[in-house]
């Protein structure tokens, strides 16, 4: 362990915080000018280690604070950081931070940043090796000089101090002080014993006269006890009689009171039932009026339906005759259309075949005429040209023109083909559309029937929902037991009335409950419930009374035990309680006591386990989640059958005990009880409030359900009505769509016919274009062949022959074409006639007849007699149901009225019984008051008798039996005689015996105490002897060690010399003989008390010459001897580190080197740390680390410097 670092602030010359760089664990040297702050640095360390500056006054503390320019320093501190790697400090940490802080009014220590006392710091330092008896690990300026100038006697005192004799002296002084106190006590005891012996002699003479007085007094007390005891027994007997009468009367009164309370409850129930029946009667009257209104409306609707049914029946015959005529016309037109379509179907294939043959003949004719025309053109053309060149030129021009024409024709051909494709696509779309319209018109009757069925189904669904909206099954809950159909809206109106009544009951129950607590608590509980709803707090459970149930037998006991705790609010955690309390405080909404479950702590109790006790908590039914709250309130209470048993268990087990009636005994012995009015029960009030709240919430929830059901029914009805309207609209569209459909079909047919005609025209045009294109291509081929042939003015023979053949073929082809064209024209004419007849005559006629058929069917559907008959049956059934319901309502009203009459009679009888019970209770109450007055007077007499008996004091045994059978008059006479005899002893000291006994006991006690003091004095004498012996041994042992170390160290410092310590005794003063105790084998023949001093004898030049006393040496030699003595003391009692302040100031150069080398040797060999200040260079040469102190602007600072800088500074100081 060593000093690792020092931090100074505000101490003497160190104003600002000065953090000194860590010290070396070996040898550290500090240099600086005089007045720079070196000594203040050492003073700071001594300030912390308490070597000095122990008991500081205000002025002394002020002197330690820095004084300089600027703001005044109000506090200062010095902090030393020790390296504790060797764990000499028992802290378990590698470092120890010790700080001392002072101010004008404070002086405190801290260990590792924690406050500590001065004793703690001193004990810790001593445990690490800082000896209180050896302060020489710190050597300030002047201490070496003081050792040099010490007298031999002072040096002996120093040796004793190092040996630790101060401890022995302190314990010896304490022992002597105790011995002095013991002697003083012994003297006082002797004085008291003398006084007691004198007083006992006086009391011995008074005992005989006192003995006679006591005999007469004993007789008096026996007689008085007999009289008082008999009077006490008479009073007790009379009190028992009164108590028996009271108990019997109380039981009768309790029975009558219970009957009275039960009668009041029954009357309240009857009144509630009467009110409910009357309310039911009002509801039934409303039902009856509404049912009669519905019956009138249903009868009116039935009459209208019957009238409509008759009208439909009259119109049905005329409709059937018109339909027969229409059916005949429709059949004739359909037959004609079928004939025409059959003929057209046979004609169309023949027409197509004839047309194909005509097209083939025309193609052959066109081809032959084209070839003949080319040959004629060639024949006439060749005559125009002179040579082949002209011909070829013309041919090439023609080929070019024809190719251009071919391109143009091909373009027209492509466009025509596209037009044909478009028309075919249109036809492909029109044909299925036309077919669909035809099928739609043909199937229109089925569609109308299907739509009619859907419309009827929608009507049935609408009527069913309307009935469901009007009527529901709802059981009656009060007087009547019948179940009748109620209307939802009517039930909703009833629930509104019930809700208002329930809300009023809740308000009444809340007012009743609030009267049982203070106003602020009532407001607070209401506010907590509101806050819970508004903020949706889950951990707020409710008041304690709301969280449990109990049997009525134990209700009074539970209320008495809980008291106002019934209204404490149970929450899950204190955080929840804090949150609610903050809101309550902000709103100023009353006061509430919370019970946070996480903060409640219950201790296990020794509950009695017996047949006549029951733990109260076992009689409560509650959720185990609230166990802590109920244990906190009820866990320490038991239920006992009576107050006597309760008192016994309360005293023996330290619990609270109560009876079922509410009488209570707590563990401190207090008894409470009396009458409890069960009609003012807080638990009943809480239960009543909870009941009406549940009723209110139930009815409110039912009202919400009804409204929701009504809304759902309204939505279903709206949806059904919408669906019905949609279907009726669809039916109307179907009924009215006959004309538009047929018009659309005609339009589609016309368009389709037009497109077919266009298609035929386009196809004919396409064939013509293809023929023209083929002719142009043949022409180009012929021109190209002619271009490659030789030039001739006339046709060749082959061409002439071909021309002749073509002329004959063209005539034949033309005749064939004309025959085929005639056949095709004939067939086409017939086909056109049939198509026009169908399109212009028969199909329109058919459409007209079908439209008329649909109209007839529509007219028949609108007056559907079946639908009217179904509506007639439905209305008849509704009237029957209404009649049945009216009969049930009448019956229910009659039953409700009978029940009201019956309950009213019962209520009147109960009221008469209650009046009689009240009179009986009042009469007994008056009797009880008289009995209580008698009991009070007798109890007072009994108390006086008991007080008189207690005044008699301790009675002899014969007092209880001696006059047991003696007549009371005789006892009174004897008492009179005894009192007369006692008058003669009025002057007697009645406390002589008591005083004699007290003085005897005191004498024995004092004698025993004196013997103890004698033994204590012997023990103290023995202790003083032992302490003296140990002190002598410690001094002799210390001298031997210091003497041996002094000789060794002196020899190291002065190798050529020799030094030793010499003990001086009283017997040596005349002879001046020296007694060298250096030899360890020599026995001590003289007591330490004979020691008068310690001398130093040294020789600096020889080990054998005569030695000199220290007084004979020079100043430097004296300082060296003093240092050798310091080193010897330190060697005997090593410290963790050493502080030397300019110890080499007065040494010669050669000895300074030796001292410096000694410090280095000790540091290396013992791992001791040295922190030294010096003005000499010798220590700097062996130092491991050098520091320089400077003084600037009236403040000191200390920094690390190199050895060279330190040496330079020392040299400058010399110059």
UniProtKB/Swiss-Prot annotation:
UniProt-listed Gene3D superfamilies: 1.20.1060.20, 3.30.70.1620, P-loop containing nucleotide triphosphate hydrolases (3.40.50.300)
Ranges for region Disordered: 313-332, 654-676
Superkingdom of the source species: Eukaryota
Principal cellular location given in the protein's record: nucleus
A GO cellular component annotation in the UniProt record: mitotic cohesin complex
GO MF: ATP binding; ATP hydrolysis activity; double-stranded DNA binding
GO biological process, one term: chromosome segregation
Keywords: ATP-binding, Cell cycle, Cell division, Coiled coil, Mitosis, Nucleotide-binding, Nucleus
Binding site residues for ATP: 32-39
Biological role stated in the UniProt entry: Involved in chromosome segregation in mitosis.
Protein name as catalogued: Chromosome segregation protein sudA
């Amino acid at each position: 362990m060593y000093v690792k670092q020092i931090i100074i602030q505000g101490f003497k010359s160190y104003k600002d915080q000065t953090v000194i760089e860590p010290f070396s664990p070996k040898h550290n040297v500090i240099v600086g000018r005089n007045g720079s702050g070196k000594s203040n640095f050492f003073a700071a360390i001594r300030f912390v280690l308490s070597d000095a500056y122990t008991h500081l006054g205000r002025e002394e503390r002020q002197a330690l604070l820095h004084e300089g320019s600027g703001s005044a320093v109000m506090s200062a501190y010095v902090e030393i950081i020790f390296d504790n790697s060797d764990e000499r400090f028992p802290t378990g940490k590698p470092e120890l931070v010790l700080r001392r802080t002072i101010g004008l009014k404070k002086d405190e220590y801290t260990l590792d940043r924690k406050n500590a006392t001065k004793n703690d710091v001193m004990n810790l330092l001593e445990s690490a090796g800082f000896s209180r008896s050896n302060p020489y690990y710190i050597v300030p300026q002047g201490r070496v000089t003081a050792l040099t100038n010490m007298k031999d006697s002072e040096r002996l005192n120093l040796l004793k101090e190092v040996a630790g004799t101060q401890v022995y002296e302190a314990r010896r002084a304490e022992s002597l002080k105790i011995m002095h106190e013991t002697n003083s006590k012994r003297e006082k005891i002797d004085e008291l014993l003398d006084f007691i012996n004198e007083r006992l002699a006086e009391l011995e003479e008074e005992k005989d006269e006192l003995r006679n007085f006591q005999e007469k007094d004993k007789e008096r007390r026996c007689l008085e006890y007999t009289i008082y005891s008999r009077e006490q027994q008479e009073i007790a007997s009379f009190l028992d009689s009164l108590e028996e009468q009271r108990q019997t009367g109380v039981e009768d009164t309790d029975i009558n009171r219970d009957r009275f309370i039960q009668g009041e409850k029954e009357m309240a129930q009857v009144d509630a039932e009467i009110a409910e029946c009357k309310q039911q009667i009002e509801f039934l009257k409303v039902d009856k009026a509404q049912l009669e209104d519905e019956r009138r409306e249903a009868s009116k609707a039935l009459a209208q339906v019957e009238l409509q049914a008759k009208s439909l029946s009259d119109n049905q015959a005329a409709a059937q005759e018109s339909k027969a005529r229409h059916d005949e016309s429709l059949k004739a037109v359909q037959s004609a259309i079928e004939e025409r379509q059959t003929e057209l179907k046979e004609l169309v294939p023949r027409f197509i075949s004839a047309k194909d043959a005509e097209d083939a003949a025309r193609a052959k004719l066109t081809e032959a005429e084209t070839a003949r025309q080319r040959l004629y053109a060639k024949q006439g053309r060749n005559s125009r040209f002179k040579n082949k060149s002209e011909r070829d030129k013309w041919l090439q021009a023609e080929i070019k023109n024809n190719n251009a024409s071919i391109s143009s024709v091909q373009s027209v051909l492509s466009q025509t083909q596209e037009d044909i494709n478009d028309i075919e696509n249109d036809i492909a779309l029109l044909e299925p559309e036309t077919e669909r319209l035809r099928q739609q018109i043909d199937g229109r009757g089925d569609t109308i029937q299907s739509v009619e069925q859907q419309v009827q189904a929608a009507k049935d669904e609408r009527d069913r929902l309307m009935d469901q909206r009007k009527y529901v099954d709802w059981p009656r809950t009060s007087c009547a037991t019948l179940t009748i159909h109620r209307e939802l809206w009517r039930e909703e109106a009833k629930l509104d009335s019930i809700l208002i009544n329930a809300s009023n009951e809740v308000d009444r129950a809340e007012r009743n409950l609030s009267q049982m607590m203070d106003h602020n608590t009532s407001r607070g509980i209401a506010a907590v419930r509101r806050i819970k709803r508004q903020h949706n707090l889950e951990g707020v459970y409710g008041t304690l009374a709301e969280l449990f149930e109990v049997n009525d037998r134990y209700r009074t006991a539970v209320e008495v035990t809980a008291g106002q705790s019934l209204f404490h609010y149970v929450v899950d955690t204190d955080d929840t309680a804090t949150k609610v309390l903050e809101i309550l405080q902000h709103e100023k909404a009353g006061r509430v006591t919370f019970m946070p479950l996480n903060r409640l702590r219950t201790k296990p109790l020794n509950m009695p386990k017996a047949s006549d006790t029951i733990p109260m908590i076992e009689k409560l039914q509650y959720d185990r989640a609230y166990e802590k709250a109920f244990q906190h309130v009820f866990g320490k209470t038991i239920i006992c059958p009576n107050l006597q048993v309760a008192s016994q268990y309360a005293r023996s087990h330290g619990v609270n005990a109560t009876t079922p009636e509410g009488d209570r005994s707590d563990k401190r012995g207090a008894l409470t009880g009396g009458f409890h009015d069960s009609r003012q029960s807080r638990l009943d009030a809480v239960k009543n409030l909870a009941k009406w709240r549940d009723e209110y919430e139930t009815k409110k929830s039912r009202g919400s359900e009804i409204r929701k059901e009504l809304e759902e029914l309204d939505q279903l009805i709206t949806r059904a009505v919408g669906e019905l309207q949609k279907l009726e609209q669809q039916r109307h569209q179907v009924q009215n769509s006959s004309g538009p459909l047929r018009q659309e079909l005609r339009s589609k047919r016309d368009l389709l016919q037009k497109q077919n005609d266009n298609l035929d025209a386009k196809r004919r045009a396409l064939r013509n274009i293809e023929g023209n294109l083929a002719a142009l291509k043949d022409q180009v081929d012929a021109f190209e062949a002619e271009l490659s042939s030789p030039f001739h003015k006339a046709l060749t023979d082959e061409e002439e022959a071909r021309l002749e053949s073509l002329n004959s073929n063209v005539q034949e082809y033309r005749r064939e074409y004309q025959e085929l064209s005639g056949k095709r024209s004939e067939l086409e004419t017939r086909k056109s006639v049939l198509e026009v007849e169908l399109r212009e005559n028969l199909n329109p006629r058919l459409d007209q007849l079908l439209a008329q058929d649909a109209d007839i069917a529509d007219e028949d559907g609108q007056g559907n007699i079946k639908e009217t008959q179904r509506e007639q049956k439905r209305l008849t059934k509704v009237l029957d149901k209404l009649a049945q319901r009216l009969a049930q309502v009448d019956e229910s009203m009659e039953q409700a009225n009978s029940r009201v009459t019956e309950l009213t009679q019962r209520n009147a009888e109960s009221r008469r019984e209650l009046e009689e019970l009240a009179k009986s209770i009042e009469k007994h109450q008056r009797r009880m008051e008289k009995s209580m007055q008698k009991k009070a007077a007798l109890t007072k007499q009994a108390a006086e008798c008991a007080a008189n008996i207690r005044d008699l004091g301790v009675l002899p045994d014969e007092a209880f039996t001696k006059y047991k059978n003696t007549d009371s008059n005789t006892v009174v006479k004897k008492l009179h005689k005894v009192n007369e005899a006692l008058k003669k002893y009025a002057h007697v000291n009645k406390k002589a015996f008591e005083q004699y006994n007290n003085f005897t006991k005191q004498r024995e006690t004092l004698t025993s105490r004196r013997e103890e003091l004698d033994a204590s004095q012997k023990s103290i004498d023995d202790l003083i002897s032992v302490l003296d012996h140990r002190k002598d041994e410690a001094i002799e042992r210390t001298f031997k060690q210091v003497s041996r170390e002094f000789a060794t160290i002196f020899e190291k410092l002065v190798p050529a010399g020799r030094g030793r310590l010499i003990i001086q005794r009283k017997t040596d003063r005349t002879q001046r003989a020296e007694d060298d105790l250096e030899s360890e084998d020599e026995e001590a023949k003289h007591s330490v008390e004979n020691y008068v001093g310690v001398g130093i004898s040294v020789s600096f030049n020889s080990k054998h010459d005569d030695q000199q006393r220290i007084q004979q040496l020079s100043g430097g030699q004296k300082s060296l001897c003093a240092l050798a003595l310091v080193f010897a003391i330190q060697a005997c009692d090593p410290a963790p580190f050493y502080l030397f302040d300019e110890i080499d100031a007065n040494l010669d150069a050669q000895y300074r080197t030796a001292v410096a080398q000694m410090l280095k040797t000790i540091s290396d060999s013992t791992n001791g740390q040295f922190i030294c200040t010096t003005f000499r260079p010798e220590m700097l040469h062996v130092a491991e680390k050098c520091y320089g102190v400077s003084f600037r602007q009236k403040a000191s600072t200390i920094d690390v410097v190199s050895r060279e800088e330190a040496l330079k500074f020392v040299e400058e100081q010399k110059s």
